[in-house]
From Swiss-Prot:
Family as reported in the entry's similarity comment: Belongs to the RecO family.
Tagged with keyword Disulfide bond: no
GO cellular component, one term: bacterial nucleoid
Taxon lineage: Bacteria, Pseudomonadati, Pseudomonadota, Alphaproteobacteria, Hyphomicrobiales
InterPro entries: ARFGAP/RecO, DNA_rep/recomb_RecO_N, NA-bd_OB-fold, RecO, RecO_C
Function: Involved in DNA repair and RecF pathway recombination.
One example of a Gene Ontology biological process annotation: DNA recombination
HAMAP family the record matches: RecO
Record Gene3D superfamilies: Nucleic acid-binding proteins, Recombination protein O, C-terminal domain
Keywords: DNA damage, DNA recombination, DNA repair
Descriptive protein name: DNA repair protein RecO
UniProt keyword DNA damage, yes or no: yes
Length: 249
């Protein structure tokens, strides 16, 4: 058995004296593990870091075997990310989200979104909006997508500023006003369907993480006996600290 594919490194663990088991999210073969001979060496260390993109060749005698990887770096992001606390926490959290996907099950849209998210991690605010969008995409991929296209009560498609915590559907300003204290806020950058580069405030980011966090916890994590990762909390705290330092008085 042999295939080649693009991949993003999610995690690495030592195997034996010199080897390493590498976990990739690949474009066409999903989340997939393989053994890299000599992967524990200092020569391989810069390549085998979470967040780096690689061209992978996987070989095994049988499809169900762990198999072996040969990896070639195509985008080495890790060195830059290690200099920023939000990026370190962010890539760890993104990897934990990707691990919610079944192994060896292709999710090309998620792969492409992960790649775009990692490529735009230099700016803290952009990184936060992209990560919120990624969490929304993961909810949809796992069968728990939110309906933010129209008001659940009236069908209106404008002034959608709330989300029902029960149904996960948008609610308009007029319909939601009597119950505003019981509804979640829908951030402007999600309402406007922009690319996350503008139209957000600090409050929008807090609302966004509250929104995705609520549904991830209830629908995905708690049924698996899990909670939010420490990396998610670390990312949010790093973003909050950065925005507080750079706020205009």
């Amino acid at each position: 058995m042999e295939w080649s594919d693009e991949g993003i490194i999610l995690g690495v663990r030592r195997h034996g004296e010199a080897g390493a088991i590498v976990e990739l999210l690949t474009r066409s073969h999903g989340r997939h593990l393989g053994l890299v001979r000599g992967g524990a060496s200092s020569r391989m260390r810069p390549l085998l870091q979470p967040g780096n993109s690689v061209l992978a060749v996987w070989r095994a005698r049988l499809d169900e075997h762990l198999g072996y990887y040969q990896l070639e770096g195509t985008r080495m992001r890790a060195a830059t990310m290690l200099a920023s606390s939000h990026a370190v926490y962010g890539v760890t959290h993104l990897a934990s989200l990707a691990r919610l996907l079944p192994e060896r099950d292709p999710h090309e849209d998620i792969y492409e979104m992960l790649e775009r998210t990692l490529d735009d991690f230099d700016d803290v605010g952009d990184a936060a909006t992209h990560l919120i969008r990624f969490e929304l995409a993961m909810l949809a991929e796992l069968g728990f997508g939110l309906d933010l296209s129209a008001c659940a009560a009236t069908g209106a498609t404008v002034e959608l500023i709330y989300v029902s915590p029960k149904s996960g559907s948008a609610v308009s300003r007029a319909a939601g006003e009597p119950w505003r204290d019981k509804l979640l806020r829908l951030p402007a950058f999600l309402r406007d369907d922009n690319d996350g580069r503008n139209g957000w405030s600090d409050q929008d980011l807090r609302d966004g993480f509250d929104l995705t966090g609520r549904f991830l916890l209830r629908n995905v994590l708690e049924p698996r006996g899990q909670g939010h990762s420490d990396a998610r909390d670390g990312f949010i705290n790093a973003v909050t600290r950065h925005l507080a330092r750079t706020a205009i008085p």
